Swiss-Prot record:
Protein name: Ferredoxin--NADP reductase, leaf isozyme 2, chloroplastic
Modified residues (Phosphothreonine): 216
BP-aspect Gene Ontology terms: electron transport chain; photosynthesis
Swiss-Prot/TrEMBL keywords: Chloroplast, Disulfide bond, Electron transport, FAD, Flavoprotein, Membrane, NADP, Oxidoreductase, Phosphoprotein, Photosynthesis, Plastid, Thylakoid, Transit peptide, Transport
Length: 366
């Protein structure tokens, strides 16, 4: 049984999780994951050692790609939903919880891993619900909150027995000048390893990955909206499966306020090293970067630099767009596409409806 020690380098505070290996880069730490055992099978997928950051392999031989018939994600066999409901949730255990934003970041974001013992058979792109401990002001149990899953279907430990989340701690001042803390986000960010957590789900089919391994997948994320894309990208570039090998193009646009909030940056940079021809990575750091006109660099501003290329990709029937994060980015992206489509005599809003119908435009915003 093969085993590999995996180190994922994540930006975090100085008080993060245990460090493995040498000294971390400034404002980062390396989260050590237990040895991965690749004799396991998950959902029919045999997974072998692909995530090691220390081994060098020869470039693979050129492969012949074949056209894959488009199959609706929502009709894929084996996708489980609502196995666990609020009245009978699954009780998992917190295995790891570490802050992944820098000390100077505007707010805290945490990466956490929960045990599932294989009882929550989720897919990349699904969500789970979390029911925080305690009762509300009416004396009733807190309602569940949904969170996008941040790990691939086999989990961060590659044993199909864990699920990971990426959660920002919600703290704000209301109109009365009172400090308000989000119930579930603070519950999760304060969890200690060994603590129990009540989980529901999995839920959702909107954000499932396309089955076509030759597809172009454009991912647009802001903040913790990166969660489902981390799950996609781990499957594409850190794992090997008997029935799936990604040969297409993955293009990630990630928008954040500061460089200390570039979540999972070192993981993504490692993926780019592994597959430079198949993975493109563009950051938009609004408080630190500007475009040529001096405008703040939001995600739509960065996309505008590639607008013609993006439009050409969107004309193809094997291009899929996934958007996750703050709702405000939708309008900015529409504004770019309206002008581009008009040059070809196309009404963008009508065209976007067609893309949605063919499951090529997938949105999960809040």
């Amino acid at each position: 049984m093969a085993a590999v020690n995996t180190v994922s380098s994540l930006p975090c505070s100085k008080a993060g999780a245990a460090v493995a290996g040498g000294a971390p880069r400034p404002s980062t730490c390396s989260v050590f994951y237990p040895p991965r055992c690749w004799s396991k099978r998950s959902s029919g997928n045999g997974v072998r050692a692909q995530a090691s950051t220390t081994e060098t392999t020869a470039a693979p031989a050129a492969e012949v790609t074949t056209k894959v018939e488009k199959v609706s994600k929502k009709q894929v066999d084996g996708v489980v939903t609502n196995k666990y409901r609020p009245k009978e949730p699954y009780t998992g255990r917190c295995l790891l919880n570490t802050r992944i934003t820098g000390d100077d970041a505007p707010g805290e974001t945490w990466h956490m891993v929960f045990s599932t013992d294989g009882e929550i058979p989720y897919r990349e792109g699904q969500s789970i619900g979390v029911i925080p401990d305690g009762i509300d002001k009416n004396g009733k149990p807190h309602k569940l909150r949904l969170y996008s899953i941040a790990s691939s279907a086999i989990g961060d430990f590659a044993d199909s027995k864990t699920v990971s989340l990426c959660v920002k701690r919600l703290v704000y001042t209301n109109d009365q000048g009172e400090i308000v803390k989000g119930v579930c986000s603070n519950f999760l960010c304060d969890l200690k390893p060994g603590s129990d957590v009540k989980i529901t789900g999995p839920v959702g089919k909107e954000m499932l990955m396309p089955k076509d391994p030759n597809a172009t997948i454009i991912m647009l994320g802001t903040g913790t909206g990166i969660a489902p894309f981390r799950s996609f990208l781990w499957k594409m570039f850190f794992e090997e499966h008997d029935d799936y090998k990604f040969n297409g193009l993955a293009w990630l646009f990630l928008g954040v306020p500061t460089s200390s909030t570039l979540l999972y940056r070192e993981e993504f940079e490692r993926m780019k090293e592994i597959a430079p021809e198949r993975f493109r990575l563009d950051f938009a750091v609004s408080r630190e970067q500007t475009n040529a006109a001096g405008e703040k660099m939001y995600i739509q501003t960065r996309m505008a630099e590639y607008k013609d290329e993006l439009w050409e990709l969107l004309k193809k029937d094997n291009t899929y767009v996934y958007m996750c994060g703050l709702k405000g980015m939708e309008k900015g992206i529409d504004d770019i596409m309206i002008d581009l489509a008009a040059k070809d005599g196309i009404d963008w809003l009508d065209y976007k409806k067609q893309l949605k119908k063919s499951e090529q435009w997938n949105v999960e915003v809040y």
